[in-house]
């Protein structure tokens, strides 16, 4: 039986969404620079005839696949929105207006109004920042190795908090808020290890991304911020940082179970509906 798959070729990861033999939504993930592995996997799936490709590296991958498959292109923001809408429905959320923050290699932020999206902005701080700084500071360069170490790390020896600055004096804002990411590394002798460094890197990224998302949400008086992206996958530490900061500012954070695959899901649904 002929089948269709959706591919989201991102800057760091390439995600694939397809229906398995039991018609269950299934995912595969590869590093985007491992194109040989992607092609080898596709060759083993002999039923695939059509591929819908989205993402920043879609053109590169399309050039390698166009002779073997029918290719459908889709704008990555449209694909992501289709995927997010599908996941929201599956997870029983009834939300029409929200800020969508997609933490990939960098971070892209959109306003979503029903089926309409408007790019609010973004930042170069994202998953690529986590991996780049992790490599520079600890020489650890695999996301799968970063996550377990981050879980046991502490930011206390590296970040300066508001409480550190004010001491016992009453401060105008919450003492637990970060006053300077990595600030203690330059000012005092502090005991820290690789786990602490990795936890602090994630704190930096999480707070920058959340602060920007909150500013956009506040500007348009939007209550819900949906955070997606592969950077959040199994990354409870980063999710907790984002969640607590978002709630502190009286906004509602939402993390979708398969949010990192939303682009691939959207591509699959778009091509499947177009075909039918």
Curated annotation (Swiss-Prot):
Active site: 76
SUPFAM superfamilies: Actin-like ATPase domain
Gene Ontology molecular function: ATP binding; pantothenate kinase activity
Keyword Disulfide bond: no
Pathway noted in the entry: Cofactor biosynthesis; coenzyme A biosynthesis; CoA from (R)-pantothenate: step 1/5
Catalytic activity, reaction form: (R)-pantothenate + ATP = (R)-4'-phosphopantothenate + ADP + H(+)
Disulfide bonds: none
Keyword Kinase carried by entry: yes
One CC-aspect GO term: cytosol
GO biological process, one term: coenzyme A biosynthetic process
Enzyme class: transferase
InterPro entries: ATPase_NBD, Type_II_PanK, Type_II_PanK_bac
Pfam hit, one: Fumble
This protein's UniProt keywords: ATP-binding, Coenzyme A biosynthesis, Cytoplasm, Kinase, Nucleotide-binding, Transferase
EC identifiers of the protein: 2.7.1.33
Annotated compartments: Cytoplasm
Primary localisation category: cytoplasm
Chain positions recorded as ATP binding sites: 8-15, 105, 127-131, 143, 230
Signal peptide: none
Family: Belongs to the type II pantothenate kinase family.
Subunit structure: Homodimer.
Function in brief: Catalyzes the phosphorylation of pantothenate (Pan), the first step in CoA biosynthesis.
The protein's name: Type II pantothenate kinase
Organism name: Bacillus cereus (strain ZK / E33L)
Name of encoding gene: coaW
């Amino acid at each position: 039986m002929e089948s269709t798959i959706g591919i989201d070729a991102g800057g760091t990861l390439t995600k694939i969404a397809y229906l398995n033999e039991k018609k269950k939504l299934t995912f595969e993930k590869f590093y985007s620079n491992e194109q040989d592995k992607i092609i080898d996997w596709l060759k083993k799936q002999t039923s695939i005839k059509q591929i819908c490709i989205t993402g920043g590296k879609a053109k590169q991958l399309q050039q390698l696949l166009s002779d073997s498959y029918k290719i459908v292109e889709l704008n990555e923001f449209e694909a992501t929105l289709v995927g997010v809408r599908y996941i929201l429905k599956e997870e029983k959320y009834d939300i029409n207006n929200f800020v969508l923050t997609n933490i990939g290699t960098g971070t892209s932020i959109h306003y979503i109004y029903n089926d309409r999206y408007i790019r609010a902005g973004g930042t170069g701080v994202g998953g690529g920042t986590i991996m780049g700084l992790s490599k520079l500071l600890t020489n650890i360069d695999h996301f799968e190795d970063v996550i377990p170490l981050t879980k046991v790390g502490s930011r206390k020896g590296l970040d300066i908090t508001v409480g550190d600055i004010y001491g016992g004096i009453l401060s105008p804002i919450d003492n637990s808020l970060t006053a300077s990411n990595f600030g203690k590394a330059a000012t005092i002798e502090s005991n820290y290890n690789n786990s602490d460094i990795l936890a602090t890197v994630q704190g930096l990224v999480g707070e920058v991304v959340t602060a920007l998302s909150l500013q956009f949400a506040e500007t348009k008086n939007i209550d819900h911020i949906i955070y997606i992206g592969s950077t959040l996958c199994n990354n409870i530490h980063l999710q907790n940082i984002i969640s607590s900061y978002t709630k502190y500012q009286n906004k509602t954070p939402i993390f979708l179970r398969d949010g990192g695959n939303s682009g691939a899901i959207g591509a699959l649904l778009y091509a499947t509906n177009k075909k039918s």
